[in-house]
Amino acid sequence: MAQTGTERVKRGMAEMQKGGVIMDVINAEQAKIAEEAGAVAVMALERVPADIRAAGGVARMADPTIVEEVMNAVSIPVMAKARIGHIVEARVLEAMGVDYIDESEVLTPADEEFHLNKNEYTVPFVCGCRDLGEATRRIAEGASMLRTKGEPGTGNIVEAVRHMRKVNAQVRKVVAMSEDELMTEAKNLGAPYELLLQIKKDGKLPVVNFAAGGVATPADAALMMQLGADGVFVGSGIFKSDNPAKFAKAIVEATTHFTDYKLIAELSKELGTAMKGIEISNLLPEQRMQERGW
């Protein structure tokens, strides 16, 4: 039987990242820039989402050499992505000793029917969600941390805003319901009934929910924090900008001081050009990464 980390320990590890910024990096140099800027963790991968989107084809787990290079370069936690449903990619990353695994829609799904049973792993998992149904299904499978799916690699915050608002609105609805209404709501959402009961009792999700997918500026990061995010993932936004080190520090500061508008104004000055954005309506249905997973 596989050894498993306890739910409390894995969720506690995710709670420790609360209020922070997690940055995508593709090598040791970028990882050091992220750490020096104040990132609470880094996500090691071969290509940032914008490049994955541009290249097309099948996107897989990163070469273990890249993941190890990043792990050896920094003292902060290191995450890595596995394809949805790819048991062996996840086991390989766990064996390598990564701190978290992201079962990610940014990569090409390996299984179109089943997500990983994340309860069987010692390593904590982060998963994307667009609504409370997706959020609770991932938690039931063992996710210790959630993030909005947004629309990765676009530099467009609109989908992350939509997903964060939707999850939070649905949580408020569940909290306001009487217990005898919850079973029907569970059916409508495709959500485990016991988890909805817990959300009603606690008044919140049982795990942290970060913003991700389209964060490109300090103001974007601050916006997501104001909407109730527990922290921020930045994928392409930093290392696709003109001045990655400056952008990274500015996004960390804006995430921490998300209601200090004068500071955010100062942080936003002379940053250089942000990453080139993509209008969501211009994406074909098969190009929408957020549609992956169920």
Curated annotation (Swiss-Prot):
Stretches that traverse the bilayer: none
UniProt enzyme class: lyase
Reactions it catalyzes: aldehydo-D-ribose 5-phosphate + D-glyceraldehyde 3-phosphate + L-glutamine = pyridoxal 5'-phosphate + L-glutamate + phosphate + 3 H2O + H(+)
Gene: pdxS
Classification lineage: Bacteria, Bacillati, Bacillota, Bacilli, Bacillales
The protein's name: Pyridoxal 5'-phosphate synthase subunit PdxS
Reported induction: By superoxide.
Keyword NADP: no
Effect of residue 18 to A: Almost no effect on activity
Protein role: Catalyzes the formation of pyridoxal 5'-phosphate from ribose 5-phosphate (RBP), glyceraldehyde 3-phosphate (G3P) and ammonia. The ammonia is provided by the PdxT subunit. Can also use ribulose 5-phosphate and dihydroxyacetone phosphate as substrates, resulting from enzyme-catalyzed isomerization of RBP and G3P, respectively.
InterPro entries: Aldolase_TIM, PdxS/SNZ, PdxS/SNZ_N, RibuloseP-bd_barrel
GO biological process per UniProt: amino acid metabolic process; pyridoxal phosphate biosynthetic process; pyridoxine biosynthetic process
NCBIfam families: PRK04180.1 (NF003215), pyridoxal 5'-phosphate synthase lyase subunit PdxS (TIGR00343)
PANTHER family the record matches: PYRIDOXAL 5'-PHOSPHATE SYNTHASE SUBUNIT SNZ1-RELATED (PTHR31829:SF0)
HAMAP family attached to this UniProt entry: PdxS
Similarity comment: family membership: Belongs to the PdxS/SNZ family.
